[in-house]
Amino acid sequence: MAQLKITLVRSAAHRLPKQRKIVKELGLGRINSSVVKPDDAATRGQIFHIAHLVDVEIIK
């Protein structure tokens, strides 16, 4: 199964509370922090809400 490397490239400060919560739930703290998550519907849904804050790479 593929995995996604998610990197926070813009700050979550001054964003909607829902967006800040998603960033925290993904395990992203500071700008340029990265996490690897499974490529499933739940993760894709979270990324959809904060796509303007993160970069996503597919890892095989």
Curated annotation (Swiss-Prot):
Database matches in SUPFAM superfamilies: Ribosomal protein L30p/L7e (SSF55129)
Gene Ontology terms for molecular function: structural constituent of ribosome
Biological processes annotated in GO: translation
Domain of life, source organism: Bacteria
Pfam families from the UniProt entry: Ribosomal_L30 (PF00327)
Keywords: Ribonucleoprotein, Ribosomal protein
CDD domains: Ribosomal_L30
UniProt cross-references to InterPro entries, sorted A to Z: Ribo_uL30_ferredoxin-like_sf, Ribosomal_uL30_bac-type, Ribosomal_uL30_ferredoxin-like
One cellular-component annotation, GO: large ribosomal subunit
Family label: Belongs to the universal ribosomal protein uL30 family.
Subunit record text: Part of the 50S ribosomal subunit.
Record-given protein name: Large ribosomal subunit protein uL30
